[in-house]
């Protein structure tokens, strides 16, 4: 059995030094999902996190990981620390705590606002697709931070569709067009409330949750300006 604290600390040191590796050393590599989740718990206990990323799996389940650090504002420059790629997402911020075992009504009521967001997409592994799933889960599912746009109240944000356009230096870099979820993202929140409590960080007011890639991951280029536009607002950053 690995030391979850040692693995979390090793990965964090790599992040701060801007280094990548082929794979975790054998004595730090989680053997299964439970050990990877223990690494997430150790990370949350030791390092700042503004919330969670969550995404649906191909078999109808969910995956989640803590977000790294504090959110960056719109218009941020990533020139000094550019990740390899970015995803365009819908984010939400909680206005109240949400405990495990919550109902759909409680999950909906806990949402304070919706936002356009960018997930900064990076990994401590040189080839993240070449390492095992538990190692990726321990590395917080490739999260390198988040940029969050202006808030929209639920009554303002919820529409029949989510339409997003993404541009690099004014050129089309991706589009997304899909129905707004029937449950208003409640099912994912209900699952995440249980998950977060088990990791030792129950969902609370102010937590930011990004809900899965709508566009991307899109590889980033240096010296470019990226902008997303949708009914949730406009959000941009530079590299």
What are these regions (language model features)?
Residues 2-184, 217-221, 225, 232-239:
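Catalytic-core "active-site belt" of small-molecule-metabolizing enzymes
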Residues 185-217:
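A conserved acidic, glycine/proline-rich C-terminal tail/linker
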